[in-house]
Regions:
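Catalytic histidine neighborhood in serine/cysteine hydrolases
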Residues: 56-78
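Conserved alpha/beta-hydrolase "acid-adjacent" motif
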Residues: 44-54
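Mobile cap/lid helix-loop segments that gate and shape the active-site cleft of serine hydrolases
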Residues: 1-29
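Catalytic active-site module of serine/aspartate enzymes centered on a nucleophile-bearing elbow/loop
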Residues: 79-113
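Hydrophobic alpha-helical scaffolding
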Residues: 23, 41-45, 79, 83
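Alpha-helical scaffolding segments of alpha/beta enzyme cores, especially the outer helices
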Residues: 54-57, 95
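Short beta-strand/loop motif that positions the catalytic acidic residue
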Residues: 33, 39-41
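A structural signal for short secondary-structure junctions
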Residues: 30-34, 47-48, 60-63
């Protein structure tokens, strides 16, 4: 992951990439969001949780309909992008979308519950 991030930002290492990434913020943009916004982040993400919690707090402060879900090591899916359990991330996203659109999943023919 560090190699990829360094490559994306044109850095020779992760420290240089992190420095180049500092200007990339959603301040001044996020409050223009008109649709619900979901943030899923691994609680043990190598990039940390401080950035996403700050983004969440900023969105709430500016009236954005935002949901934050931090995954834990106990449920797996706590790594970056839920690499340790991608199914969990997919389930969280799709359940959230069902809630947003008012879909009662128990009425669906393929619902396993």
């Amino acid at each position: 992951l560090a190699g990829h991030i360094s490559w994306v930002f044109g850095g020779r290492n992760m420290a240089e990439a992190a420095e180049k990434a500092k200007p990339f913020k959603l301040d001044g943009v996020l409050e223009k969001m008109k649709c619900p916004y979901l943030i899923i982040n691994g609680g043990a993400d190598v990039l940390g949780v401080e950035g996403v919690t700050a983004m969440y707090d900023y969105a709430v402060k500016h009236g954005v309909n935002v949901t934050l879900r931090l995954t834990t090591p106990d449920e797996t899916g706590a790594d970056h992008c839920q690499h340790d359990n991608p199914t969990l991330g997919q389930e969280l996203m799709l359940d959230w979308l069902a809630d947003i659109f008012g879909i009662d999943q128990s009425t669906l023919a393929f619902y396993p519950g």
